[in-house]
Amino acid sequence: MNTNQIKSNNQQAQRKTNSPCLKIVPLGGLHEIGKNTCVFEYGDDIILIDGGLAFPSDGMHGVNVVMPDTTYLQANLHRFRGMIVTHGHEDHIGGISHHLKKFRIPVIYGPPLAMSMLRGKMEEAGVADRTTIQTIEPRQVVKIK
């Protein structure tokens, strides 16, 4: 099935049920190591999954880190409900402090170790007061409003 068929099938399903569809918009982390960041969009709500960075390649002189393009997210901040962190590797949490310098993240959910690591990074960057961190346990259900 090609992309046009998928879009057509999604549009038909949406028209039949009159309910929104889930849109998944990767901002980084595809065909590369690093920048793992993904937007999940459902109706009027947006959730960000991870906020990673990548390290520069050898030819990128003077560059310390490489960040995903968050233009789409920044254009839709009024719909942004929060972030879910999957784990504490740099390619999944390393960009969050940088993001917090540019825009507000209402709440960040994640496992205890990742949240502890993230809290330290945020304090070091001076952005710890710009969001709320919520630790979640395995199989815990969280409703993001």
Feature locations, PLM:
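Metallo-beta-lactamase
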Residues: 1-25, 41-53, 113-145
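N-terminal Rossmann-fold NAD(P) dinucleotide-binding loop
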Residues: 92
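Conserved beta-strand segments of alpha/beta enzyme cores
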Residues: 23, 107, 132-134
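Short beta-strand scaffold segments in enzyme catalytic cores
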Residues: 35-40, 142
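Pre-active-site segment of Zn-dependent metallo-hydrolases
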Residues: 32-35, 44-85, 97-106, 110-114, ...
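Short Gly/Pro-enriched turn/cap motifs at secondary-structure boundaries
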Residues: 28-30
